[in-house]
């Protein structure tokens, strides 16, 4: 019965690591979405560069928009985290956004490395479980219980 207990323990560990991998994958997707938002913001700033005013649709809630005009496109209110936003010129905003993107990419790299570690552990545990199952199957065949 010791082999069965070890097998069950391995299966439990595999399930725990799979759940951990699922959580890491969700975090990876959130960070990738944030990077895409930062890229979209950078593109918007590039599109607005040198223009005094721009027509735009302004969100007013519930998926509704009003046509409006963006004036003074040389200043941007940029979120710096913790619910704090500051006014910056376009170049200052680009610098802040570039730092935010680098931080996000660094976080993504760490998450991907963690995901690889979890995947490697799952692979190792699965190999151990398969080995135990094969031994148990061999023992059952040898005793005629199969």
From Swiss-Prot:
Looking at the UniProt record for this protein, which Gene Ontology cellular component terms does it annotate, in alphabetical order?
A: cytoplasm; prefoldin complex
The GO terms this record gives for MF are:
unfolded protein binding
GO:BP terms for this protein? protein folding
Report keywords, A-Z.
Chaperone, Cytoplasm
Asked if the Swiss-Prot or TrEMBL record annotates the protein with the keyword Calcium, the reply is: no
Subcellular localization: Cytoplasm
Pfam families listed in its UniProt record: Prefoldin
How does this chain assemble?
A: Heterohexamer of two alpha and four beta subunits.
List the PANTHER family hit by this protein, alphabetically: PREFOLDIN SUBUNIT 5
Q: Which family does it belong to?
A: Belongs to the prefoldin alpha subunit family.
Functionally, this protein is described as follows:
Molecular chaperone capable of stabilizing a range of proteins. Seems to fulfill an ATP-independent, HSP70-like function in archaeal de novo protein folding.
Name of the featured protein: Prefoldin subunit alpha
Native organism is Methanobrevibacter smithii (strain ATCC 35061 / DSM 861 / OCM 144 / PS)
